[in-house]
Amino acid sequence: AVALKYEVGEEGAPVILAMGRGLMAEKIMHLANEKNINIFSSPLLARALYFTGKIGKEISEDLYASVAAILAYIFKIEKGEFLEKPEIEIPSDLQFDEYGNKKVED
């Protein structure tokens, strides 16, 4: 799980607040639920952020479009719109398995 912070109107890209695997991921998601923070499930994106990012740093520029699509979706549903969950595209060179190995195209 990866927790991001982004303030509309602020300069800069979203920042990684927390990230973890296994038990830590469960704690991150539990805390988000407790605080009524929307959770968007995309294991492929979570892995890309986890294996290319650092806590306290902005996300990789290569993931801007993927994260922007999610943020746009979340902002709209927070305003009461009912939308289908978008399909998130992850650049092929940033696709990892759960162990951090780059995915090999078939």
Question: Could you describe each region identified by the protein language model?
Answer:
Residues 1-106:
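Divalent-cation
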